[in-house]
């Protein structure tokens, strides 16, 4: 009956409001199981979720946050959506995070929650190889003047990588050029590598080699892009008719970077091509 419902809830809420987390969990879960559709079911589920979360029991809180977001929009909807998204993202569960983030983007009143949703939808779509949507969200993130540089850098890299994946070279060039001005560490190494890569494609072989040298000197810690840069350098030497330098660089890459299978395979393909061409020239 209503009186028992009210009394049970009030006793539980009191524990919650006094920050007695363990007692709040015990009494709120008692209320929720006794009155699943009780007068205070919405508040009780939200407070129970918050208590679990505060006690480090994030997985336990999911069902109660879900109860809140499945009800008509209420004062706890936005906070529950943000919390659920955070819990799923922490576990890299992008399949569960995506629909929650979409709702948060659409329903949030706080601008920082919209920004959070857009930045994470961008990462989620990229992770799921949905490059078209990843770019849509990266563009939203970049268009937001309040986005901080770290997230802008992430957005720029996603635009660039997605463009490479879908062979949109003009977009990739622009994105990597912008990235070069803001990136640090490994992202800067990646941007420099593509700078050398596009210079090679444009026939600027000397300039491309200078960029590879800068990559090797300033970003020596990032071996993967260093190795890929050396392959570009070998291609430059080949175009400049210096087959000896080209083959010795490629042989060195194959020997020293065997742990990067894609790099080794690319170097081998390039080496086979140069040797094949040389054999043709010698036999003619």
Q: Predicted regions span which residues?
A:
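Acidic, polar-rich low-complexity tracts and alpha-helical solenoid repeat scaffolds
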Residues: 1-284
């Amino acid at each position: 009956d209503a009186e028992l419902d009210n009394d049970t809830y009030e006793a539980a809420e009191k524990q919650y409001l006094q920050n007695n987390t363990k007692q709040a969990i015990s009494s709120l879960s008692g209320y929720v199981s006794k009155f699943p559709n009780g007068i205070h079911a919405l508040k009780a589920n939200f407070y129970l979720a918050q208590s679990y979360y505060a006690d480090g029991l994030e997985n336990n809180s999911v069902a109660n946050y879900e109860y809140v977001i499945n009800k008509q929009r209420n004062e706890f909807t936005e906070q529950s959506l943000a919390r659920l998204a955070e819990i799923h993202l922490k576990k890299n569960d992008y399949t569960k995070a995506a629909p929650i983030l979409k709702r948060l983007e659409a329903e949030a009143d706080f601008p920082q929650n919209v920004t959070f949703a857009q930045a994470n939808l961008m990462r989620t779509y990229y992770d799921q190889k949905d490059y078209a949507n990843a770019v849509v969200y990266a563009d939203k993130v970049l268009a937001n003047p309040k986005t901080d540089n770290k997230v802008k850098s992430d957005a720029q890299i996603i635009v660039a990588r997605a463009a490479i994946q879908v062979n949109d070279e003009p977009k990739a060039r622009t994105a990597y050029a912008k990235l070069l001005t803001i990136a640090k560490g490994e992202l800067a190494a990646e941007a420099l590598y593509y700078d050398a890569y596009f210079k090679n494609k444009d026939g600027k072989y000397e300039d491309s080699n200078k960029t590879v040298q800068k990559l090797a000197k300033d970003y020596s810690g990032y071996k993967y892009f260093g190795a890929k840069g050396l392959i570009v350098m070998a291609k430059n030497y080949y175009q400049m008719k210096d087959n000896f330098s080209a083959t010795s660089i490629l042989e060195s890459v194959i020997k020293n970077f065997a742990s990067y299978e894609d790099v080794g395979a690319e170097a081998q393909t390039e080496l086979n091509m140069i040797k094949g061409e040389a054999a043709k020239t010698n036999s003619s």
